[in-house]
Amino acid sequence: MNETLSKFNIHQIINFISQSNISGVVIMQKLEIDVLDQLKLRTPLVQCSEFNEVNDISYITIDNLEATRKMLRYILNAGRKQIALVNSDPARYTYAKLRLQGYCETLEQAGITVNPLHIVTVPDGNFSTAVSAISALLKTASPPDAIFCASDIMAAAALRACALEGFRVPQDIMVAGFDNIDISVMTTPNITTINQPRHDMGFMACTQLLSMIADPTKLPQRFILDTELIIRESTDF
């Protein structure tokens, strides 16, 4: 389960699980607690990547706070101070909430006042929407000298926006993303990013689910995995 879910198809899924011979479910979309409570009555559950903090449901995720701190410290050490965050919706996604928190905390610890105008929310994470939002940011009186994006898709959008508005990357503006997906090495310049251990998360989620199916009395577990900073051309010159 990893697509955007409406209330209607949530009920469809609950009914489907109730009426089918399903042994367990790995959830990759943040679900409301009441929905998780309904699902866990019907089948073993493991949350993977996105999660809601529920005492009796396991999850595997990454350390979004530390990953953000890692990227911000790298950019700050490169001498950039006016760092913008292009994020998904913190009210909707746990990872976006944690990355916003890490962004604000790291800047404050560096003695830099967070500029609300440098926090851009792109709720759908869409490339075209992000290009428009970042272009608007670059047209302001105080454009950033670095842009940290919550995904590589939005970082690619930042590269496009910089090109449209006449900014050089990385000379004028550093650009960094998150995820280390294929697009990060398909752009010019290549995108500095945070590598998520996607294989490990998937493997651990399935292993945890299988152990819960084998032993229904097994207590829930939480695994928070580390990430890796991948430095590429969009910040390195």
Task: Identify the function of each model-found stretch.
Residues 1-33:
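Central regulatory/effector-binding core of bacterial HTH transcription factors
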Residues 11-18, 23-24, 40-47, 51-237:
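Bacterial carbohydrate/catabolite-sensing allosteric modules
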Residues 31-42:
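Active-site-adjacent beta->alpha loops and helix N-cap segments on the catalytic face
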